Regions:
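Conserved interdomain linker/interface between the two RecA-like ATPase lobes of SF2 helicase motors
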Residues: 15-108
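A short beta-strand element within the Helicase C-terminal
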Residues: 182, 186-203, 208-211, 226-230
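Single conserved hydrophobic/aromatic residue that forms the stacking wall/gate
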Residues: 2-13
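Conserved C-terminal RecA-like helicase domain
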Residues: 72-182
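Arginine/glycine-rich "motif VI" loop of SF2 helicases in the C-terminal RecA-like domain
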Residues: 133-134, 215-225
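Beta-sheet entry/capping signal
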Residues: 1, 31-33, 109-112, 121, ...
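Long, hydrophobic alpha-helical segments
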Residues: 220-264
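Conserved nucleotide-binding/hydrolysis micro-motifs of P-loop NTPases
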Residues: 26, 39-43, 118-120, 146-148, ...
């Protein structure tokens, strides 16, 4: 676990030539972000892991028509793999165990789960409530809606006013809302300083990955740092993103083998 990804991951990296992420932490503007891999907890087989690796390869490829068509096929496979009921059950059980025993969550209990898709976000949500029926105010799904959504989805997702209300509650440290399940929303430009832990169940890379994990690096009271918990093998993509988007951090962490540095 306690492997520091950077000495602070934040929006400051946009000005990387002047103010890199290492400097941000040294100046007290952000907190360190730590990485923990729990991919092994899902007990995914080799074929599944290879499919996930292909997803990262496609992200790195040029978006020509052939790649786009291949991506559609791989996305369909990823949905089936990551949305498997047994895998979701294992995932949620492990997330809850980690959440309830992680000292970083003792401060305010704010955590975010990044789901691969809207369907998977709903599965995670319902599984959490099956385990903890009394958590209806503690956990929420925050994602876009569609007029094709089933009625039961609409009741959970709500309208724009409902999403705005959820945002206010999540930023309020005294609110009972502690866990937000997201897909794309809230991963950029949404700051909750008390947010301590992000559970990642979605392949991400580059700019999008850096923006996402920056959600947990804000300064708050006695918060020592943010924690990114990985369930889909983002380590290599994370290392590459750090090399691409930082200056001094590239020197500090560019040669680090993230996969070996973390503890399981």
């Amino acid at each position: 676990r306690d492997f520091c990804l950077s000495r602070g991951l934040g929006d400051v990296y946009k000005r990387q030539d002047i103010y890199d992420m290492t400097q941000a932490v040294e100046d007290g503007a952000t907190r360190p972000v730590y990485y923990e891999s729990r991919v092994v907890k899902l007990k995914l087989d080799e074929n599944t892991l290879r499919t996930i690796d292909k997803e990262y390869d496609l992200m790195a490829a040029q978006a020509d028509q052939g790649v786009i068509e291949q991506s559609k096929h791989e996305l369909s496979r990823m949905e089936a793999i990551l949305g498997n009921d047994a895998t979701i059950n294992t995932l949620v059980t492990d997330i809850l165990d980690h959440y309830e025993n992680n000292r970083e969550n003792l401060l305010t209990g704010k955590a975010m789960i990044v789901a691969y898709s809207r369907e998977i976000a709903m599965k995670i949500y319902h599984r959490i409530l099956e385990i903890h029926p009394d958590w209806t105010e503690k956990v929420a799904v925050v994602m876009t809606s569609s007029n094709k959504d089933p009625e039961e989805w609409r009741d959970v997702i709500g309208n724009k006013a409902h999403k705005n209300e959820l945002a206010k509650k999540f930023k309020d440290n005294n609110s009972p809302l502690k866990i937000a399940i997201v897909v794309d929303m809230w991963l950029t430009g949404f700051d909750v300083p008390s947010l301590a832990t992000m559970y990642v169940y979605k392949p991400m890379s580059g700019y999008n990955l850096m923006q996402a994990i920056a959600r947990v690096n804000r300064v708050f009271r006695d918060k020592e740092g943010g924690l990114v918990v990985d369930y889909v093998g983002i380590a290599t993509a994370l290392k590459q993103a750090m090399n691409d988007y930082t200056v001094r951090d590239r020197k500090n962490y560019g040669d680090t083998d993230v996969g070996k540095a973390v503890s399981y």
